[in-house]
Amino acid sequence: MALYRGNSRKLIASLGAVLVLFVLVHQLSYVDYYTLVGHISASTELIQACPRPNRPKHKTSHDARQAVAGRNIPNIVHQIWKTADVRTYPAWSSRDSWRAGLEPFNYTVWLWTDDDIVGLIRAEYAWLLPTYEGYPQNIQRADVARLVVVHAHGGIYADLDVHPKSVQGVSCLQRLGLEAIFAPTSGALGLSNHFFMAERASPFLLWALHEAKRRGASTSRRIILPYLQVFWSTGPMMVTAASRDYDRARAATQPVLGVLDDEYGGTVVRHAAGRSWHRSDGRLFNYLGDHVHVEQPWVGFPLLVAALGLVCIMVRRRGWRWPASRPGKGVSF
């Protein structure tokens, strides 16, 4: 009988390990291609300074971009919060910093509320409304909302934890003649959406909105980890994947998008990175992203396996068991 119990436990443990491995592989399948390559897409230019030093005297692609009719990024700063009272934001809001720093230079700082966003989508992006309302997490709606407002009006988007450091730097980026410019993620291999700017009716932003709809609410629910679910469906993974597809569709001969070099970007804006919406999985991945270069699979995958192994060891040592559920109640987490 004891032998039977021992074999049963081993079998259950083996089946559990196989199940965990299957779930892990399934979740990793949602990690987009940009995390597996060592360069940005051809349509995206890495911006390391503005204005660029040592410009050649002959006509350049930059000069050609400047000549594109109507290509400019308006002097509008967009920010989003649930209501018009930013005092309810859980960290120091950057709204006053943007107003004090840029309004004297003929900039307008707009604060969009949840009701404003829904009204704009109903009026001009009705095809997106079911997807927008179907997201299980508010941050997914916020991710889509920022793309919508900048596509509709053009200008600059900044999270409420992004503070301006250089008005001249912001203005210079607007004049580079690029369609859109984004803050970096994954060591400038990807595009982040906490700070970006674009021309009005940017074709790329519209492309990204359609990509967000394609990855809509029902599809994103297949992802178990909330952090990965957000990043894949509406966040930096989605935006970066959209930029690569946009690049392939356009077959561009010169960059139309820009991503800030991490060091240079830090001279233009400061990101306090409140990350108030993140759960434990998000905090873990953010720590790894901040301290370890995990963009390559031979680094990232072993780290995930090691983390999984550590959890298994802790569970085994503590002799963890499922808590007995009370009659009429499920297990709470």
Where in this protein do the model-derived segments appear?
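Small-residue hinge/turn detector
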Residues: D143-G155
